[in-house]
Amino acid sequence: MSDPEKGNPKLIGQPVQTWYWYDQYLNNPYWVANMYNDYLKRDRLLANITLDAKIWQNIKYQTRFNVDYVTQNNLNEEYAGMNRVGFDYVGGKYYNGDSRSSDIYNDHMLTWNDRFNDKIDVNVAVGTSFSRHYDRNTSITTAIDTCGVPNAFVPQNNKHSRPNNPNGSATSASDSWNNKDWSTALFATASVGLFDKVYLDGSYRLEWAQSFQQFTQGSGYKSFDYYSAGVNVLIDKFLPRRDWLNQLKWRGSWSVVGNPIPNTLFARQSYDFSNGTISTRPPLFDDPQPETTTSFETGLDVWMFENKFNFDLTYYNSTLRNQFLYVTTANGESKPVNTGKIRNYGLEFQASYRWNINKDWRWQTGFNIAWNDNRILETYKTESGAPYEVQMGPNAFKIKYVEGGRYGDIYVNSFARDENGHIKINDAGNYENAVPVMASGKYETKVGNMTSPVTLGWNNTFTWKNFTLYFLIDGRIGGKVMSLTEADLDLYGL
């Protein structure tokens, strides 16, 4: 189907839509199901090799090597007559893309464990790891409608090869790109057990990532370190033995972990092959840092009644720093920065019970509930020193990240109201063209938060011989939901 008033003689003899509504958003669903073809073929190779060797007494060596290789082909064909935004396809659309990627991981580790005087256990591990990622993509597309001969889905049938094609409304394109990334690290972990009652753990990691090396200016490799410490105390070992108590453990941990910035060349300038121009240099990335999360956690684990019943209670507090994002500068440029501080803290509780009804029947049930609160403690400061507001979302509402607010706060435009609380209308005498008066149009009214502070769940597993039935009921308490459908219904008075 083409424009019913102008017609399209090139589609004579071709399959077309039979559809009453000629609208850019409406297509016959059977047409879409059968004349919009998308083929995807993927081949994947996975390989894992592990080598273990005993060097001397309690010292062991292990190395692992993993490879993940993927090739993929994506072919997309849209037949002429598909209605799109602002036009209809008079020739059809064609896309063909080939990609391949590989991920390689290798590590080497030495471990040593021993027990002294039948009271102290020591476990130590040191090692190094290396990972590498590579991907390449080549694609050919007729980017809107460039097929000179309708529904001939081959790369030769495009506006470039047929410059006099009156039906070509956009150019075709060929694209090829590749990406490489690597990271390497040195790490060490240690665990000490005292009298089978107290266990102390610690770890350290020194990491190099390719994304940071562009900022070294030839002065070596830039690295970052992460670390953690933990303690576990078996309290029941310090108490008189009780038959109903199997284990009572207190645990605590503290850690600093991080993620590198995206692996892209931040000072990259683009070259236009059609006219030979070079884009302006983007703003500099000042003092790039990894995104880091500092976490503290403590809790109790309890096992009772021959390990049939157990529960644990956990308190956690974590702070995310140096989030990577792009901000808009005063002159409208997009600048990469590390900024912000978001704190999350909360409580988690879970319990489970196992009942062996008889030799064939068994029932296990579990319940969990968690409460979480977060606060945005810091955001990026503009050149004037004012906090920078990050917002996202459709025109109906925005999710704003404002200093002092919470992650997921929803803001909307509000209506101006008169002294009686009624919404003001821009022209009360002409109701046909009248529209409500907005208070500001800058999404300044906070209406709630989209995240639920409380989550919970109840699971049950019934086992009879070799047959198992499992079901889960979960839920969220709190949080706001925005309905764009309801807004459209209000528009039509429904």
Segments the model singles out, each with a brief description of its role:
Residues E5, W56-N58, R115-V122, K197, ...:
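Short loop/turn motifs that connect adjacent beta-strands in outer-membrane beta-barrel proteins
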Residues E5-D52, R162-T189, G193, Y199-S203, ...:
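Outer-membrane beta-barrel transmembrane strand signature
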Residues R42-R44, T50-C147, S191, A209-F224, ...:
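Small-side-chain secondary-structure face that scaffolds active or pore-lining regions
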Residues L45-I49, S102-H108, V122, T184-A190, ...:
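Hydrophobic, lipid-facing positions within transmembrane beta-strands of outer-membrane proteins
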Residues Y61-F65, V122-V126, L200-G202, N246-G252, ...:
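Transmembrane beta-strands of outer-membrane beta-barrel proteins
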Residues F65-V70, G127-S131, S203-E207, N232-L234, ...:
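Outer-membrane beta-barrel pore domains and translocons
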Residues Y134-N167, L239-F296, K308-I342:
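Solvent-exposed loop/turn elements at secondary-structure boundaries
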Residues T138-C147, V337-R343, R354-M450, D488-G493:
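Conserved small-residue
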